[in-house]
């Protein structure tokens, strides 16, 4: 269930992007080609991801110009200046990142040190893209519980140091595609938000921006690792299992990778989780005025849009906002950088809602948050938590004659409501299946021939029995639904074969 908030407001947002923007031609000065395949992969990836400019915290010689902690500190300073708040007024700092400049201590403590900030509560959220939302939730909970009046959430990423050509020398400048292509996907940057217990939105002209809820859900028990740093390509050994860092580097255990073959599952679970939020009344697509969606490539826009449309829960494209093309993909920082630029460039009105969605490929996670604009002159609204399902439409099944067999994509409103509920049921069922001993054996490559024969001995009779049940059920159909019998018979035949 999402975590609801009654007294948390976004007061200001800031960002820090190092140096000058780097276009697609200039990239080679920072992320030099590794081998003869590099230029071909680069052209393909850039054509798909739609990124025209990005930022790097290293120079053309590969030297670090800004540390990750300095990036985060820069975003915090920008955020505080925009909010007109002194650092001494903040009593909590939560950070989100895939990794700071040190393995220890925590990233939030390194940022606090970089800022020379006074004593305060700190929390370091370690993850990938959703870590920024995790930092926001932690800061918001501190305010909601009354422990803090002002709290900062910051997310910062600096993957460029992993992409320098020199990093691949130990492997003879050769690497697998899962590691190679990310060099043209990710870049550096930081974003920060200042949360408070009631202050007006900075520059909002008499508006407040209320954080309604945050929802995070991980499916790491269902799926294998998709994006990782620290394991070999086959995921059999970790970097600490080698005799030295040099051995780990030569084995590719220090290369950042993403298994793109698993990505379709990420969008599938993300949309199903969104459908559940709609079904339970946490968000109404018709009420969403601005949709801030984090995606790593513009190639995925039609994928997300198509899945939302099929679920009957689409948000019109004109309401979408992204700055991927000119800010780049900055991982955990992306959604905070996006919020900062959105608030600086858009005019908001009371009653508008801002819905944010962040999928994380690391080991599959989906994060969402909902903001609502209020007039600063009005008393704070205490919204009741959703109860049961959201009412998406007033139409009932009796209002429409459904000509079987029907097309779910063109289903009437009453049926769309049912399909939304069924999507949630399928979502839970699939998760349970993925965690069964049988599927775990397959995932972990422990599924041997005897296991397969045993499975088939149990499964084939069940399928045959199921086909008989389908045909018996089809034989009992009458009236308007009798036309479905032929379709069921075809499906039963396919199952049996």
Over which residues does each language-model region extend?
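Long, hydrophobic, well-ordered secondary-structure blocks that form the structural core
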Residues: 97-99, 113-114, 126-142, 153, ...
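Non-heme di-metal
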Residues: 398-497
